[in-house]
Amino acid sequence: MTKARTMETLRNYYSLPGFVQESEDVTRLHYLEQFGLSEADLQALPLRPENRAYVDCMINAAKNGEGEAECIMACLPCMLSYGWIFQKMLDRSPAVRDTLYGPLVQDYAGPGYADACRAWAAYAEKVCTGLSPERAARCRAIFHDCSVHELHFWEMSAKPRTDL
């Protein structure tokens, strides 16, 4: 909730963890149980280098930025990529709904998540309107850098772990 200056900002910050807690978390916990794993098992694993670099980039953007514009630019690529990727998957292969991962796909391709993405994008537009040219450029750079890390995150998911 770093650098939040208004209640509106706090509400927007809380909306993403709210989705995770209410929807994605339930689905993820179901998968863990199904595969005989626990949340503690996952938490004990070291972050992969791609994840560590991404997390560090996001934290640095929030810590070193002037306020909410930098924070949201660091978070938005993650949120938008999930919605876009899972919606494309569903559009191309509707039968994915009937697979093991159908519930996960539906979490991110559903109307509730699409609404949340639109709300976050609108909020980003609002907090980035009127920024100085220098700060706007920094925000674009943060969005770009985090988008590149998001791409590496998705690429990483196709590579088996070699560090365990």
Segments the model singles out, each with a brief description of its role:
Residues 11-115, 148:
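Active-site-proximal alpha-helical scaffolds that flank and shape metal-associated catalytic sites
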Residues 31-32, 83, 124, 128, ...:
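Hydrophobic residues within well-ordered, non-membrane alpha-helices that form the packing/core
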Residues 138-164:
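Acidic, carboxylate-rich catalytic segments that either coordinate divalent cations
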Residues 110-144:
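Long amphipathic all-alpha helical oligomerization modules
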